[in-house]
C-alpha cells in the first residue's frame, strides 16, 4: 500500500527491503509470496536479520542462500558481534563470501539471554574494523543509524560521535532506525555531514500494519510515534477502512518528503509482509 500510493516517484527510486529468516514451512511460504510481490520493484538489495539475541542466527545463512539462488536477489546478512569470538565471526564471514555475498549489515546486536559477556568485539565499530582487516573491500558494509538517538546513548552528541566513528572505521553506508518525522532524518543527516560523514545515509521505513505492535516495537528501539498520529488513530475507533488506509497514507507522505529532500534510497522494514509495504 505504501509503495503503491506514490507510484511514479517511488518506482523510479532505489529501494531495498529487510526480511527476517523464517523458521517454519508456513513462514517460508509467506516469505516467498512476499518476495515475489516486492521484487517487482527491482530492489537494489535485501537484508536478512538474525533475530533478537541471535535467536534465529542459524536460519539466516539458509535464508540468504534461498533469496540469492531462488529469487536472484542481492541478499545481505545482518551480522552481530555481541557474544561471538573473532574466530567465529571470521568463519561466518567466510561462509557468506563463499555464497557470493558482497554486502552485509554490521551491528552490535543485543546480548543473548543468559550471556553475561559482550564477547571479544564490543561495538559495531569493532566489527567494521575486523571485516576490513580480514576481508579488505570484499564486502559493502552497512551500519545502523539513529535519527532520534539510540536508546542506550548518553545523549545525542555522544550518539553522533559513535556513529561518525563507525563510518570512519570503514562503513560504506548506513541504514537508519525507522521514524515518522522526516525532519528528524534531515537534522541527523545535516549533523552527520557536519561531523565529517560523507557516506550515504538510507532512511529506514516501517509500514504500519498493526498499530499496537508498532507501539511496542517503538518503545523498545527508541523510535518516536508522533502524538498527532496516535490521536488520529484513536479517533478512527472501529472504522476498519480508516485504520487501514490512513497509516499507509502517512507513510507514503513520509516517503515523498524524504525523496523530495534528497534521501538516496528507501529501505523498508517489511516484517515479511507485502501488503503494508
Language-model-derived ranges and their functions:
Residues 18, 46, 96, 166, ...:
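Conserved, mostly hydrophobic/aromatic
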Residues 26, 119-146, 195-248, 253-254:
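Active-site pocket-lining/capping segments in soluble small-molecule metabolic enzymes
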Residues 2-48:
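Conserved N-terminal beta1-alpha1 strand-loop-helix module at the mouth
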Residues 19-22, 49-53, 78-84, 109-111, ...:
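Active-site beta-loop-alpha junctions enriched in small/polar residues
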